[in-house]
Amino acid sequence: EKETAYQAIYSAIHDVREIIPEAIFLQAEPDLVGMSDLADLIGCTRQNIRKLLTNDSSSPSPCYSYAFSLWHLADILFWLQESKSYAIDQSLLEVSEVNMKLNISVHQLKTDKNTSTDRAIKDLAKFAVFNQLSIR
C-alpha cells in the first residue's frame, strides 16, 4: 500500500519528536521556492521560468516579492500541470501541497491568540479572498 505524502511527513515529524523531544519545528520543505529552485526542480532554465511566470497573467502570484520573489511550490506545480500541461511528479506535487498547508497552519497556530483582532483579521482574509465578510 502506497504511503501518502501526509503519512510520510507525519511519520518524519513523529520520528524526530521521538529522538529529539525538544526539537522546534520551523518549516517543512519544499514549500517556498525562488526561480532558481523552480528551474532545478522542474528541469529547465531560470530564464524559462522567468518567461513562464512573467508572460502569463494566470501564473500564481509570489507570496513574497521585494529584492527577489518566492512562491509556494505547490501553487506553481499545480499551475504548470493544469495550465501549461507540464508532466509533474505527483509525489512532489503532493508533498509540496502538504508542506504548504502545514507551514501555513503552524504559522497561524504560533501567531493566533484568538483575540477579537485575530477574529477580525480572519474575516478580513475571507473578504479579501472570497469577498465574504461577517461583521462582528
Task: Place the predicted regions along the sequence by residue.
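Major-groove DNA-recognition helix of helix-turn-helix-type DNA-binding domains
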Residues: G43-L70
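Conserved G1/Walker A P-loop phosphate-binding module
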Residues: L73
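Polyanion-binding surface elements
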Residues: Q27-K51
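Conserved short beta-strand edge segments in small beta-sheet-based binding/regulatory domains
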Residues: H14-P30
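A short, Lys/Arg-enriched interface patch at domain edges and termini
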Residues: I76-N131
